[in-house]
């Protein structure tokens, strides 16, 4: 497992470094769920997320909220070198239980794009409206995904 995490970190570094240096551009990393190995194609392990956070907070990157990236680009402003945004799709519960505490502790902004139908049906694998409000009130940005995904 440790070798896999290092492999992901090496790939992440190799992908981010040259692309994030382009003038007035940003790389957006997109996640779905965390610590849910039964969904390997969309899962990020806790160890992988910790490695990504360590890399993103190493001082080599400028992590910005997606709203700020878009606002600066729309204003014709140049983004800082190596700008990175973080996006999480769908609104799975593991965002609240695993990712948010780690990202918050690291001071990394991120945007969650919610598929509201799952929340309205009170799916046990998805965030609740109360959890969404709690995260929003703590500074997490939310965007629209769709109703039914």
Where are these regions (language model features)?
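Positively charged n-region of N-terminal signal peptides that target proteins for export
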Residues: 1-5
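Bacterial N-terminal signal peptides
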Residues: 6-15
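Sec/Tat signal peptide C-region and signal peptidase I cleavage site
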Residues: 18-22
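Short hydrophobic/aromatic-rich motifs at helix boundaries and adjacent loops
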Residues: 23-26, 70-72
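Metal-dependent polysaccharide deacetylase catalytic core of the NodB/CE4 family, i.e.
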Residues: 24-40, 59, 80-84, 92-149
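C-terminal domain-boundary segment and adjacent tail
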Residues: 44-78
């Amino acid at each position: 497992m440790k070798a896999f995490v290092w492999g992901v970190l090496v790939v992440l570094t190799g992908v981010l470094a040259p692309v994030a240096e382009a003038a007035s551009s940003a790389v957006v990393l997109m996640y779905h769920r965390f610590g849910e190995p039964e969904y390997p194609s969309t899962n990020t392990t806790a160890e992988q997320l910790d490695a990504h956070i360590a890399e993103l907070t190493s001082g080599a990157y400028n992590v910005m909220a997606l709203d700020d990236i878009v606002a600066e680009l729309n204003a014709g402003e140049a983004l800082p070198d190596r700008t990175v945004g973080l996006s999480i799709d769908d609104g799975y519960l593991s965002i609240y239980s695993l990712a948010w505490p780690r990202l918050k502790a690291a001071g990394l902004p991120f945007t969650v794009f919610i598929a509201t139908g799952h929340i309205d049906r009170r799916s046990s694998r998805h965030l609740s409206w109360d959890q969404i409000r709690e995260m929003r009130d703590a500074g997490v940005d939310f965007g629209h995904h769709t109703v039914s995904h």
